[in-house]
């Protein structure tokens, strides 16, 4: 048994395996200088400074900045920027990469053209040095020579990339093909472009390969093979996240798309460890869309508590990895509170099954101690077949919530509990079993519009919550959901004012009040 302590020493699933000083970190560094756009073919949001740093390094950008004021014709600068533009447009376009991989002659013509431009720059440097042999002329020639050498290095690296990519694709196809169908190993431009970002629209690097396994059983082998190939593994479901968790930060990354893992079980009464009575639950694969689970629960007369705004597109695996909530979280908590069991693959390529004991069928912070049984199974076998080890994890219930805040999205460690709220950093969620609930018989929805200063209306949220929490303790009405909409959101959705005032509200609160006593619900609504 272990209790919550420091984080275990495990590799990070979606962190770059090799540090690249001119890679993603340099690309996303704050750019305080003017965003000059002299590099041609740059249709991206990267500035010239960011591109030069990625391709040539910080020193080269400093030299270019110093030489900018000494230009006469600017022809050498234009040729250098053309070289960088050609390299950049290929690196940022998987379709061009595939075309050049398939056409060695065309690729060689491009590389020769890049070398020709650099040779012309060197000729102009020597001519300028012959004409201006003074100290400023020699310094200028020295800077140009340094830039030419750096650019030749970039061209050589660019030329080598194609052979390296082709070789890595051959190795990856062979290794990954042992774990899944070859049709599920995608190197094509469409797949890579489709997985370069999530709902953030933040683009850093294109992934090397996209994997679309057919079954849960294939995941463990794929993760193990990816790490043996030196690839960073990035789990991805519906791609609806707003934290950038599915955004590749290294070109040597493998995105594992779990959308085919769409097994959805029937609602059934299940015996949970430490619970005296059977509990309604539902099993779902990581790729099941949240809406499908919600509808399956409703069809059986139950409620699925996890209802993020993205429920029509988000997937179950992402709900676990993000500890998703929604409006019903007020009543039953977030994903963590409603999980009875989940399975994942850890960075070692082994199965990890987490089972909650003594489930209170409510918010986890309401109990003194939450207990989780962790079981690791050999990834070379079917899930649950060959046990490696097990342990019991005990965590104080209050540890999962921050006082005065509730869910703390900055707490990724979450007391050492695997999978939940980790955004895929400690493993890939493959399936889960959820506790379902019964909605009280009567429901009323209240819409409150506020027309004064927004800051004066904010305390009403706390007052409503406190009032209804107090009534629920006395067996009365319960607050099932409370949603706050600010003026900007209201205007974006074209909100129609409900009151007779000739003004647009600064804030709207929408609350669901529920209970088994119709009179109590009506009284709370009037209050």
Tell where the protein language model's regions lie, with residue ranges.
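FAD-binding subdomain of flavoenzyme oxidoreductases
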Residues: 263-274, 280-464
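Generic non-transmembrane alpha-helical segments
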Residues: 171-182, 221-231, 296, 460-471, ...
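Glycine-rich, acidic/polar active-site loops that bind/position phosphate-bearing ligands
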Residues: 341, 431, 444-465, 469, ...
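Glycine-rich, histidine-containing beta strand-loop boundary motifs that form or position
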Residues: 235-239, 246, 258, 286, ...
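N-terminal flexible segment immediately upstream of the FAD-binding catalytic core
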Residues: 2-224, 241-280, 309, 435-436, ...
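Residue-level detector of anion-binding/catalytic polar loops
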Residues: 231-232, 303
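Flexible, glycine/charged-enriched surface loops at secondary-structure junctions
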Residues: 180-189, 304-309, 392, 399-407, ...
């Amino acid at each position: 048994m272990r209790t919550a302590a420091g984080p275990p020493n495990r590799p990070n699933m979606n962190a770059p395996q090799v540090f690249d000083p001119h890679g993603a970190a340099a690309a996303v560094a704050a750019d305080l200088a003017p965003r000059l756009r002299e590099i041609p073919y740059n249709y991206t949001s990267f500035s010239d400074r960011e591109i030069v740093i990625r391709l040539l390094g910080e020193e080269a950008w400093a030299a270019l900045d110093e030489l900018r004021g000494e230009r006469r014709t600017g022809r050498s600068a234009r040729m250098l920027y053309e070289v960088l533009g050609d390299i950049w447009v290929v690196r940022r376009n998987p379709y061009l990469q595939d075309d050049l991989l398939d056409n060695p002659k065309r690729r060689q013509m491009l590389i020769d053209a890049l070398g020709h431009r650099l040779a012309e720059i060197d000729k102009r440097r020597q001519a300028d040095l012959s004409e201006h042999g003074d100290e400023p002329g020699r310094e200028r020639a020295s800077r140009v020579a340094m830039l030419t050498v750096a650019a030749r290095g970039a061209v050589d690296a660019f030329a080598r990339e194609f052979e390296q990519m082709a070789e890595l694709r051959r190795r990856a196809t062979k290794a990954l093909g042992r774990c899944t169908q070859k049709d599920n190993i995608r190197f094509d431009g469409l797949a890579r472009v489709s997985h370069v970002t999530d709902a953030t629209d933040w683009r850093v690097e294109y992934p090397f390969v996209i994997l679309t396994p057919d079954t849960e059983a294939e995941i463990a082998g794929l993760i193990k093979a990816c790490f043996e190939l030196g690839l960073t593994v990035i789990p991805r479901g519906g791609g609806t996240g707003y934290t950038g968790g599915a955004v590749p930060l290294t070109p040597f990354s493998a995105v594992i798309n779990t959308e085919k893992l769409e097994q959805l079980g029937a609602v059934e009464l299940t015996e949970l460890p430490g619970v005296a009575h059977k509990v309604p639950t539902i099993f779902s694969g990581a790729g099941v869309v949240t809406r499908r689970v919600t509808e399956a629960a409703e069809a059986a007369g139950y409620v699925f508590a996890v209802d993020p705004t993205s429920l029509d597109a988000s997937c179950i695996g992402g709900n676990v990895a993000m500890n998703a909530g929604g409006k019903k979280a007020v009543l039953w908590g977030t994903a963590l509170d409603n999980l009875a069991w989940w399975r994942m693959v850890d960075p070692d390529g082994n199965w990890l099954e987490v089972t909650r004991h003594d489930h209170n069928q409510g918010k986890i912070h309401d109990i003194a101690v939450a207990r989780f049984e962790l079981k690791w199974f050999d990834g070379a076998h079917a899930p649950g077949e060959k046990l490696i080890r097990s342990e019991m994890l005990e965590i104080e219930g209050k540890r999962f919530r921050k006082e005065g805040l509730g869910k703390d999205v900055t707490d990724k460690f979450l007391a050492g509990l695997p999978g939940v709220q980790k955004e895929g950093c400690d493993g890939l969620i493959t399936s889960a079993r959820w506790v379902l609930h019964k909605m009280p018989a009567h429901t009323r929805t209240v819409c409150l519009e506020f027309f004064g200063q927004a800051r004066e209306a904010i305390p009403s949220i706390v007052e409503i919550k406190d009032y209804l929490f107090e009534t629920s303790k006395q067996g009365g009405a319960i607050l099932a959901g409370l949603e706050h909409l600010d003026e900007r959101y209201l205007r974006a959705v074209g909100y129609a004012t409900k009151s007779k005032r000739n003004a647009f509200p600064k804030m709207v609160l929408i609350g669901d009040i529920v209970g088994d006593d119709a009179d109590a619900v009506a009284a709370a609504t009037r209050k």
